[in-house]
A protein has these predicted regions:
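A short, well-ordered alpha-helix in the C-terminal region of glycosyltransferases
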Residues: 190, 325, 332, 339-353, ...
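A conserved mid-protein helix/loop that constitutes part of the nucleotide-sugar donor-binding site
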Residues: 15-23, 199, 203-222, 239-245, ...
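Short His-centered aromatic/hydrophobic patch
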Residues: 88-96, 112
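Conserved acidic donor-binding segment of nucleotide-sugar-dependent glycosyltransferases
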Residues: 311-312, 316-323, 332-337
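Short hydrophobic beta-strand element within catalytic cores of glycosyltransferases
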Residues: 39, 296-299
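Acidic anion/phosphate-binding donor-loop and adjacent secondary structure
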Residues: 65, 69, 152-157, 170-191, ...
């Protein structure tokens, strides 16, 4: 018997959560789990991607953040396709999925990829998202967090009277092919007009305050006084793009902002350092990709990041929201090739532990635990 599982996600961008969902959908054992996908954004780029990969995807468009109108077509879909379980990703999906589950007496669970309070540029929207997350938790059959740090935060805000079923399941990534590392390095540098002699500090992610790219820009400004051939490579797009461009241009910093780039992992060999300056981070899927590419890593010591890497063993971890700490860590790697080599080798070994097979197996077992209890 194969259980029918509907995954719900906003799908307005293609970030770590979307990549996580895609990896799950492509790798479930179809004899156990038949996955369905629903996106909540009308012109969803993620839906376009999944459809191009042959994944059946349905749009349940939300007209505004608290629009519960899609619950009606969701109920119809669940009945028609005999859905056994709804798996929600993100605050909006959790609101609709939990409400649909409650109305149908249908099991539902959520994966918390990042803390909802920090997912919005607006403070009040973040607080509202957190309020709704906590108020609708009693409607949930279970919650997955992608790090123990998120698990701790989750439980600290949960009422003791609510018997929360929750589990940490770490993200997994495919084994990417970096065998032509030098060719990839030269190709992407040429594509973006980066000189072969330049030292490149790069990052990948949505351009959002929680990702802390402004602190990386400030660090590069300081480092540019020491290294004349430094270049900042930012792969991603988002609401902070104009602000970052204005800052970098005003300070005469050599930089490239590519915008959204599919399969951005391929560009990692173009970097001499990968930096993740997040203010808050659930886990940091891209860190595992950088580790596979054997690019030295500098990252904020926040959220689930120190669960992946130890400071000075696999990466240099710095204080979040601190450009001076970030600059000092980057400088240490630039000045010490032997340290960089040790860090990359150790991080590469760690990255091999975070497989998709393990993530899919743990997720499937959690489904079965919930569905067995229901039965």
């Amino acid at each position: 018997m194969s259980f029918q599982v509907l995954h719900l996600i906003g799908g307005g961008e293609i970030g770590g959560a979307e990549q996580h969902v895609l990896n799950l959908l492509k790798n479930f054992n179809q004899q156990q789990i038949t996955p369905h996908l629903g996106c909540l954004v009308k012109n969803s780029p993620f839906a376009s991607l999944t459809r191009s990969r042959g994944i059946k995807t349905t749009i349940f468009p939300m007209r505004f953040p608290l629009d519960i109108g899609p619950v009606i077509p969701l109920i119809s879909y669940c009945r028609t396709h005999k859905i056994d379980l709804i798996h929600c990703h993100g605050a909006r999906a959790a609101l609709l999925g939990r409400l649909t589950g409650k109305l149908l007496s249908l099991p539902n669970l959520s994966t918390i990829h990042s803390w909802p309070e920090f997912d919005y540029t607006s403070v009040w929207k973040g607080r509202l998202a957190l309020f709704l997350e906590q108020k609708t938790q009693p409607w949930s059959s279970g919650i997955i967090t992608v790090s123990d740090a998120l698990q701790t935060t989750l439980r600290s805000g949960t009422k003791p009277s609510f018997p929360l079923r929750s589990k940490t399941i770490y993200n997994g990534i495919p084994q990417y092919d970096f065998s032509e590392h030098q060719i990839m390095r030269s190709s992407f540098r040429q594509q973006w007009g980066i000189k072969s002699t330049q030292k490149v500090i790069g990052t990948i992610g949505r351009l959002h305050p929680v990702k802390g790219q402004i602190y990386l820009a400030e660090a590069i400004k300081a480092l540019s006084q020491v290294y004349a051939d430094l270049h900042l490579l930012i792969i991603g797009d988002g609401p902070l793009r104009s602000e970052l461009q204005n800052y970098l241009t005003a300070n005469n910093i050599s930089y490239t902002i590519t915008g959204y780039y599919p399969a951005a992992w391929r560009a990692l060999p173009a970097m001499d350092i990968f930096a993740l300056p997040s203010v808050s981070e659930g886990m940091g899927l891209v860190l595992l990709e950088a580790a596979q590419a054997k690019v030295p890593i500098v990252a904020s010591n926040t959220g689930g990041i120190p669960e992946l890497f130890n400071h000075r063993r696999e990466a240099l971890l710095c204080r979040p929201a601190d450009s001076e700490s970030l600059a000092a860590a980057c400088k240490e790697i630039l000045d010490n090739p032997d340290l960089a080599k040790v860090l990359t080798e150790n991080a590469w070994q760690i990255s091999k532990l975070f497989t998709i097979d393990r993530m899919v197996k743990d997720t499937t077992n959690f489904y079965l635990e919930i569905l067995t209890d229901k039965g």
